[in-house]
Swiss-Prot record:
Region described as Disordered: 748-767, 776-818
Pfam annotation, one family: RSN1_TM
Extent of Polar residues compositional bias: 749-758
Listed name of the protein: Mechanosensitive cation channel TMEM63B
Parts of the chain on the Cytoplasmic side: 66-145, 228-427, 503-506, 600-619, 667-673, 729-832
Residue span of region Intracellular linker IL2: 231-426
Segments in the Extracellular topological domain: 1-40, 179-202, 458-472, 544-566, 639-641, 703-707
Keyword Cell membrane included in the entry's annotation: yes
UniProt-reported outcome of changing N571K: Increases calcium influx induced by hypo-osmotic stress
GO molecular function, one term: phospholipid scramblase activity
Residue span of region Gating helix: 567-599
C-alpha cells in the first residue's frame, strides 16, 4: 500500500500546480505566516524572550514572598528514612529550626534544603539560579531517587545529540539549502533556509538523505550510551517477591506458605501477604486524621485566646459574607469532635470488616532470588498440549484449595510503586472503566485537537475579520504558536487525569499510560495535522477515508514543504523554550489546584492542612511526553528546515535547568520501574524515523518514487521499521537496539539469605518496604490487628501522596509549637 501511495504521490505531484492556495485555504489566514520577513521568527523570538524575563522576575518575587505554595510540605517516609544517617551531622541546623529532634516527621521539601550549605546558597533574590548549577547528581539521587537521576541523564544525552545535529544541520545542511535558487533571492526570505529552495534534480539532495540516516545512527548511539550508564538498581526484596493473582479469595497465608514449601524443596517462604480491599479504609483513615488535626488546632487556639472559634462547615463557607439558612456557623471544637467520633466509628467498623474483603491476590516473599526465578518460570512456561498452552506448576496438598491452575504469577513491583486502593478495581469493571474514559478522551480531542479549530469557529462569527489584512507577525505567528503551546500544555493535564481515573495498580503503569497517550496526541496536535494543513483529527480522518484521497494526497503532503511552513514550527519551539519552561517553573496548574483547595477548605485548620500537603510526585510520564514531542518536531524538521535545531537545543537546555530545580525543590520523590525510561527511549528513536518519512515524501513529490534518492530513503526507512518492530515484538536485533541497560541489585547476599550476619526476616524489613497497605501497617502497630514482627506503632507511616496521609506531630511537639516554627521559618526567609 505504501509504495502504491508514494507512486501515486509522485505522479500527482509532478502534474500538480502550485499548492500554496490550497494549503492556505485549509488553514485560517491568521495561523500560517505568508510572506513576512524571515517568517516572523525575530519578532516572535523577541516577544517570547521578554515574556520569559517577565515570568522569571515574577517567579523570583513569588519565591521570596509567597512561601505557602510549595513550601511547608511534608516529605514521605522513604525520604525521612534516607536522611536518618545524614541527620546525625545536621543537628545544629535542625535544632535551630525545629527544636531539636522534632524534625523526624517534618521537613521542608522545597526552596531550602535540610542541608546547611544549600540553605545558605539560595537565600538571595536570584541566587536560586546559581544554586541550580551546584546541585550534584548524588544529592539529587539522595533527595529525589534514582528515577530523577535517570531522567536528567536522559536529558543530557538529548542535549549532546542536539549539539551534534545542530553543528551538522547549521554548518552543512543550511548552507546547502542557501545555495539553491528556486525561491526568491531575498535575504529576508525564510524559505531560502529550507529544502524547498533546492531544485528537484540537484545532486545535493543526496546529502540530506545521507544526513537523515546519520541522524538515526547518532540517535541510537546516544540512547545506547545513556542506557548503558543507567545502573538501574532493583531492591533485593523486589527480586525475591512474586505477585500472585487468581488465588482463592479465602486462602490463608499459612496455606500459601505450605504450598510452596511442599512443592519446591529447600524453599523458604519468609512472608505471604494476601491483599484486601482497603480503598474505603484508607479514605476513612485520612479523613479521621484530618478531623483529629482540626480538633487539636482549635483546642490549642481556644486555650491560647480563651474564645471559642466559630466556623461554617460547608465547602467555601469562609468565603460567604452573609448567613443564609443551612449555612449557619457552628462551634469549631464541637463540630470536629463529633466528626472525629463518627469517622473513628466508621473506621473501626471498616477495619473489622476488611478481612472479609479478600481480593484473591497475594505477595509472596522467598528467601533468595534463585528459587523465586524458578517458581516464576514454572508458572509462565508454555507447554502446548492440543489447543491449550499452559504451564504445569508443581502441585502440593494445598493446590486444589488454592486454585493454582488459575494463578497468574509475575514479579512484584516495589511496595512504594503500588496503589493499594486501586487493587480492588480489576477485571471487567476495570476494562469497562478504561474504555469509557478513553472514548470520552478521544471524542474530546477528536474535535479540539489544534487551536486552528477554535479560531476557525471565531471566524464564523467574524471575530477575526478586522485583523485579517494586518499581516502583522504578532497576529499571524506569535498568538497562534502561543495558542498551540497552551493547548499542548493543557493536553498532558487532561491525559494525566484520564490515566488517574483509570485506576492503575502501579504508579509506573499510570506514568507509562500517560506518556504514550500524551505523546501520540501531541504528535498529532503539534506536528502532523498542522504540517498537513488540517485543523483537527476530524478533518484528518475525513480526508484519509475520502474517495478523493489519492487525488488530493500529493497536494496535502506539499503543504509540509511550503517555505513558510517551517517558520510555524520554529516559532512553536521558541514559545516552548521560553514561555513553556518559565511556566513549568511557576507550576501554574499546581498553583491553581492549591488555590481551589484553599477555597474549598472549611476552616483555618483545613487551610493549614492544605498548605502542608500540596506537594506531589513528579509526573515523569507527562514530562517525557511533552519533552519528546518538542524533540520530535525538531528532529523531523532538522533537515528540511535546519534553522529549528538551535532553538530546539535552547529548549532542552532550559528544560534541563528547570527540571533540576523542580525535582530537587518542588516535588516528592517517585519510585518507578525502568519501563517508563525505556518507553522514552523508544520515543526518541521515533523522531529520526519521522525525519526519514518527511524526506521520503519530499523526494517522492519532487522527483517521483522511482528516483534514486526516493528509493534509497524508502529502503532505509523500511529496514529501520522492520528492525524496530522485530526488536519490540520479538526481542531480536538487541545489538542494534537503543537499549543497553545494566541491572544492579542492592547489596544483599541473596544466595545465603543473610544480611549483616542475620537472616532477612520479615521483621528486618522497614515498614515502608513491606507488601502491605500502610493503613494495615498502622493497624498492626496500634495493636488492633494480628500484629507483625518488627511492626511498631512508634514508626511514622509513609505515603506517596501528601493528600493520602495526615501525620500527627511527634511526642514533645505540640501543634502550636509547630505552627510557631512554620511562622518563624517563613518570616526568617522572607526577610533574608
Amino acid at each position: 500500500m505504501l509504495p502504491f501511495l508514494l507512486a501515486t504521490l509522485g505522479t500527482a505531484a509532478l502534474n500538480s500546480s502550485n499548492p500554496k492556495d490550497y494549503c492556505y485555504s485549509a488553514r485560517i489566514r491568521s495561523t500560517v505566516l505568508q510572506g513576512l520577513p524571515f517568517g516572523g521568527v525575530p519578532t516572535v523570538l523577541a516577544l517570547d524572550f521578554m515574556c520569559f524575563l517577565a515570568l522569571l522576575f515574577l517567579f523570583s518575587i513569588l519565591r521570596k514572598v509567597a512561601w505557602d505554595y510549595g513550601r511547608l510540605a511534608l516529605v514521605t517516609d522513604a525520604d525521612r528514612l534516607r536522611r536518618q544517617e545524614r541527620e546525625r551531622v545536621e543537628q545544629e541546623y535542625v535544632a535551630s529550626a525545629m527544636h531539636g529532634d522534632s524534625h523526624d516527621r517534618y521537613e521542608r521539601l522545597t526552596s531550602v534544603s535540610s542541608s546547611v550549605d544549600f540553605d545558605q546558597r539560595d537565600n538571595g533574590f536570584c541566587s536560586w539560579l546559581t544554586a541550580i548549577f551546584r546541585i550534584k547528581d548524588d544529592e539529587i539521587r539522595d533527595k529525589c531517587g534514582g528515577d530523577a537521576v535517570h531522567y536528567l541523564s536522559f536529558q543530557r544525552h538529548i542535549i549532546g545529540l542536539l549539539v551534534v545535529v545542530g553543528v551538522l544541520s547549521v554548518g552543512i545542511v543550511l548552507p546547502v539549502n542557501f545555495s539553491g535558487d528556486l525561491l526568491e533571492n531575498n535575504a529576508y526570505s525564510f524559505g531560502r533556509t529550507t529544502i524547498a529552495n533546492l531544485k528537484s534534480g540537484n545532486n545535493l539532495l543526496w546529502l540530506h538523505t545521507s544526513f537523515a540516516f546519520l541522524y538515526l545512527l547518532l540517535t541510537v548511539y546516544s540512547m545506547r550510551r545513556h542506557t548503558s550508564k543507567m545502573r538501574y538498581k532493583e531492591d533485593d526484596l523486589v527480586k525475591r517477591t512474586l505477585f500472585i493473582n487468581g488465588i482463592s479469595k479465602y486462602a490463608e497465608s499459612e496455606k500459601i506458605k505450605k504450598h510452596f514449601e511442599e512443592a519446591y524443596p529447600n524453599c523458604t517462604v519468609l512472608e505471604a501477604r494476601p491483599c484486601y480491599n482497603v480503598a474505603r479504609l484508607m479514605f476513612l483513615d485520612a479523613e479521621r486524621k484530618k478531623a483529629e488535626r482540626g480538633k487539636l488546632y482549635f483546642t490549642n487556639l481556644q486555650s491560647k485566646e480563651n474564645v471559642p472559634a466559630m466556623i461554617n462547615p460547608k465547602p467555601c463557607g469562609h468565603l460567604c459574607c452573609c448567613v443564609v439558612r443551612g449555612c449557619e456557623q457552628v462551634e469549631a471544637i464541637e463540630y470536629y469532635t463529633k466528626l472525629e467520633q463518627r469517622l473513628k466509628e466508621d473506621y473501626r467498623r471498616e477495619k473489622e470488616k476488611v478481612n472479609e474483603k479478600p481480593l484473591g491476590m497475594a505477595f509472596v516473599t522467598f528467601h533468595n532470588e534463585t528459587i523465586t526465578a524458578i517458581i516464576l518460570k514454572d508458572f509462565n512456561v508454555c507447554k502446548c498440549q492440543g489447543c491449550t498452552c499452559r504451564g504445569e506448576p508443581r502441585a502440593s496438598s494445598c493446590s486444589e484449595a488454592l486454585h493454582i491452575s488459575n494463578w497468574t504469577v509475575t514479579y512484584a513491583p516495589d511496595p512504594q510503586n503500588i496503589y493499594w486502593e486501586h487493587l480492588s478495581i480489576r477485571g471487567f469493571i476495570w476494562w469497562l472503566r478504561c474504555l469509557v474514559i478513553n472514548v470520552v478522551l478521544f471524542i474530546l480531542l477528536f474535535f479540539l485537537t489544534t487551536p486552528a479549530i477554535i479560531i476557525t469557529t471565531m471566524d464564523k462569527f467574524n471575530v477575526t475579520k478586522p485583523v485579517e489584512y494586518l499581516n502583522n507577525p504578532i497576529i499571524t505567528q506569535f498568538f497562534p504558536t502561543l495558542l498551540l503551546w497552551c493547548f499542548s500544555a493543557l493536553l498532558p493535564t487532561i491525559v494525566y487525569y484520564s490515566a488517574f481515573f483509570e485506576a492503575h495498580w502501579t504508579r509506573s503503569g499510570e506514568n507509562r499510560t500517560t506518556m504514550h497517550k500524551c505523546y501520540t496526541f501531541l504528535i498529532f496536535m503539534v506536528l502532523l495535522l498542522p504540517s498537513l494543513g488540517l485543523s483537527s483529527l476530524d478533518l484528518f480522518f475525513r480526508w484519509l477515508f475520502d474517495k478523493k484521497f489519492l487525488a488530493e494526497a500529493a497536494i496535502r503532503f506539499e503543504c509540509v514543504f511550503l517555505p513558510d511552513n517551517g517558520a510555524f514550527f520554529v516559532n512553536y519551539v521558541i514559545a516552548s523554550a521560553f514561555i513553556g519552561n518559565a511556566m513549568d517553573l511557576l507550576r501554574i496548574p499546581g498553583l491553581l489546584m492549591y488555590m481551589i483547595r484553599l477555597c474549598l477548605a472549611r476552616s483555618a485548620a483545613e487551610r493549614r492542612n492544605v498548605k502542608r500537603h500540596q506537594a506531589y510526585e513528579f509526573q515523569f510520564g507527562a514530562a517525557y511526553a511533552w519533552m519528546m514531542c518538542v524533540f520530535t518536531v525538531v528532529m523531523t524538521y532538522s533537515i528540511t528546515c535546519p534553522i529549528i535545531v538551535p532553538f530546539g537545543l535552547m529548549y532542552m537546555l532550559l528544560k534541563h535547568l528547570v527540571d533540576r530545580y523542580n525535582l530537587y525543590y518542588a516535588y516528592l520523590p517517585a519510585k518507578l520501574d525502568k519501563k517508563i525510561h525505556s518507553g522514552a527511549v523508544n520515543q526518541v528513536v521515533a523522531a529520526p524515523i519521522l525525519c526519514l518519512f518527511w524526506l521520503l515524501f519530499f523526494s517522492t513529490m519532487r522527483t517521483g518514487f522511482l528516483a534514486p534518492t526516493s528509493m534509497f530513503t524508502f529502503v532505509v526507512l523500511v529496514i529501520t521499521i522492520v528492525i524496530c518492530l522485530c526488536h519490540v515484538c520479538f526481542g531480536h536485533f538487541k545489538y542494534l537496539s537503543a537499549h543497553n541497560y545494566k541491572i544492579e541489585h542492592t547489596e544483599t547476599d541473596a544466595v545465603s539469605s543473610r544480611s549483616n550476619g542475620r537472616p532477612p526476616t520479615a521483621g528486618a524489613v522497614p515498614k515502608s518496604a513491606k507488601y502491605i497497605a500502610q493503613v494495615l501497617q498502622d493497624s498492626e502497630g496500634d495493636g488492633d490487628g494480628d500484629g507483625a514482627p518488627g511492626s511498631s506503632g512508634d514508626e511514622p507511616p509513609s505515603s506517596s501522596s501528601q493528600d493520602e496521609e495526615l501525620l500527627m506531630p511527634p511526642d514533645g511537639l505540640t501543634d502550636t509549637d509547630f505552627q510557631s516554627c512554620e511562622d518563624s521559618l517563613i518570616e526568617n526567609e522572607i526577610h533574608q
